[in-house]
Amino acid sequence: MRLIGILAAAALACTLAGCAAPQQQPDHSQLKVNDAGVSSDGGAQSDEGAEGGVSSAEEAKPTASELRAKLDITEDYRSDFNHGEKGASYQKYIVLHDTEVDSSAASIVNSWESSGNKVASQFIVNKDGSIVQCVPMDAIAHHAGYGDAGHNSEYGVSEDGRDDKRGTTKAPSKSITDYGMNSYSIGIEIVHVSGQGAYPETQLEAIDGLIAYIDAYYDSESTIIDHKMWRSGNSDTSAEFATYLANYRDHRTHN
């Protein structure tokens, strides 16, 4: 997804479909997540083994809470970004985006909110590996926007009423009409501008860890795509990310 920067918030919103159905008062304070007990997104599945015991391999597998605790995540939830309950059972995809602006995640969150377009991804990954989460895991965020005609069917998603669609504009063209991805996915924004250098190793390692956490949270491996796979007119992720994207889709790490 192309998210334009702080000084071009309106243009940023044109690449996203945004709306909001506040479910709680905005929490503009930031909560640093340092241990599993603090986070509100510790996992959709139980951290305990099934009755009757678990194998040694299962016992050694990190829980979602443990994986989250290893990440430098700051929660900065804004009610304008929450578009209804997604439900863990609907999670199918992780959609990777570039921010297309070289700003901090905290600044980008503020820019999204001030634009009034109600667009956001669940996570933004800074170049230093720190992460801001601005939408809960099981809430719908407007990060994918409209996709190519036929993509709802191709990707097995639909507009089934869970997305409130408030703030969403009309389909931009006859070839870009499908709008189901937001309700079935987690969006990850990567702070990067196309053509302006490599993705730092610390950032890539944070993405690795975030994907592992999401997998553990839902107790399943979501299919990894980037924004231009959903909507062919988009440019993100960049050409510099192509090898990493192939690796993520194949074995879920960047290398």
What residues fall within each predicted segment?
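Basic/polar, cationic surfaces and motifs that engage anionic cell-wall
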Residues: 2, 20-37, 43, 49, ...
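Intrinsically disordered, low-complexity segments enriched in serine/threonine/proline/glycine
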Residues: 10, 47-48
